[in-house]
Amino acid sequence: MSGLAQIHRAGIAALERPGNEPAPVICLHGFGSHALSYGAMMAALRPDLRALSWDMPGYGGSDALGMAEPSASDYAAALRRLLDTSGLQQVVLVGHSLGTLIAAAMARLYPERVKALLLLSPTAGFGAAPSDPLPDVVAGRLNAFAAEGAAAYAKARAANLVYDPSRHGDVVASVARGMAALRADGFAQAGAMLARARIFDDLAEVQCPTLVAVGAQDKVTPPEKVAMIVDAVPSHWRIEASMVVVPECGHALTQQRPLEAAKLVADVVDFQAPSP
């Protein structure tokens, strides 16, 4: 996509957009997605905002992590290494879906590195114990991917992430391209993380301004479930008392409503926390 440079640092492939904002925007994609899911949103950001969208470990050209069942903390550590290698000290994290689990873990583990959080279509995680089997939802996705292959898996599921898919075929196609590029190793690792993670615990320790948004027609993380995630954020760190609900939008918020997503990013970047 025009204006985005492909980079590879610390074993991570990413798309980068130049800018001079002191705290760059770092974009973390979801379970069945990739770095380019933020492409249209990044293109819509105002000119001063530097932005970077990674392929999380095991996705695209990024190295997989070195363990079969990584935690959200392991992904956060990989993100910290990317920031270190890129010379980035403090950033604004934008997470979508599964990416919100990594964003929340990063904010808890490395609070000095995170200026603010924007959580789009956040997922709670399943909170399963390490000794427990994978939850049925996660196991079902991994088994379907293994049985069908990436292309068929994408074709069968992409439309479910888009509001009114028959009228938004371009968005469905964009979502499907990301799913079709999934790698078995990275998808399995991310599934294990989704199974064990619990965003409520990390958000309870957030120490930065946080904004939560969801599509009004999101079938994967519907607004009524996202409302419980908002409640986990300490009230004095919420940019808005409640969540932002984006109209006529499904789960693929950054792809279906990139202009609205870009405005949310600007709101978070510009937010000035009140003095204690």
Language model features with spans:
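Active-site glycine-rich loops that stabilize anionic/oxyanionic intermediates
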Residues: 30-34, 97
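Conserved loop-alpha-helix segment in the C-terminal half of the alpha/beta-hydrolase fold
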Residues: 43, 207-249, 260
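Active-site loop/oxyanion-hole signature of alpha/beta-hydrolase fold enzymes
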Residues: 3-17, 36, 40-46, 52-94, ...
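Conserved alpha/beta-hydrolase catalytic His-Asp/Glu region
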Residues: 129-134, 147-204
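Flexible "cap/lid" loop of the alpha/beta hydrolase fold
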Residues: 104-109, 113-147
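The conserved beta1-alpha1 loop
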Residues: 28-30, 214
